[in-house]
Amino acid sequence: TEGGEYVTAWNNVYIPPILARLQALIDGNLTLTQSDVSQIPYLCGFESQITGRLSPWCDIFSDEEFLQYEYFQDLRYYYGVGLGTDVPKTMMTPYLNALMDIFVQGPSVTGKREDGSAFNLPKLLVSFLNDGQLNQLVAASGVFDEQRPLSSTHKDDSRPFVSSRFTTMRGTIAFERLNCVGAGNSTNVNATRFAQRTPPIRRSNCTQPSPPIQDNQNATYIRIRLNDAVYPIPTCNSGPGSSCQLEDYKQYIATKLENQGSWIQNCNVTTPGAPTKVKGASFYTDLSSPWLSHVAP
């Protein structure tokens, strides 16, 4: 939906002053539109990326105008595929639930090849997503659960959700499985990292139903990074490095998935014989699925 009426309303707030300023600088028969103005930052970003130097297009907007444009992108993702939506924000929950099942099993998980033989999953799993799927996964992760609905008329400069901090060229969300000694004060951490192809949000008290971890006792935690910056789960971040105990996070995601209802109904599946169970991330452990294919380098 590209943010729908929220984006339209914000465009009507921030673009007209920019349009008037730029139009006053133009001599001749050229009339700019709001759409023209909204595309200029894209020219700035993409040309800078392609050429490796700052594009002259970047000089057209002031710093504040770029921040207003940044907020436009926040609205586009938040109300297009993120927490401001109904179904789109849930689309990556089955995947994340299946990924947490792999985390719970540990770093020695085995899978099945196409010929039926077994293999050990690597300690680093990498998946490549587009920007919309990345935002859906971020929404499912829970790191922005305390974000209030974004206003379509006022830019909140203290908002936790700033899409430009993670929806970048090669933007990433990483889920780290940490095995630590003690109750969170140890620096002895062994990490297994699961990455998907960012300052931390404020913390609240940790809601931790699992038994307290005793000193000198091993425990397993989950920590989330957006473009390498740690983003704590607002309701569970008392572990080492603002992490959450893995059992608690697994239950948090499982409960979220259960509350999202039937995926047959969510996706309006009407095809006879269609699968009734969402597997989420079976492609990590089962390479024999008929819909998988190999891509030669």
Located regions from the model:
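Signature for phosphate-centric chemistry
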Residues: 1-125, 129-297
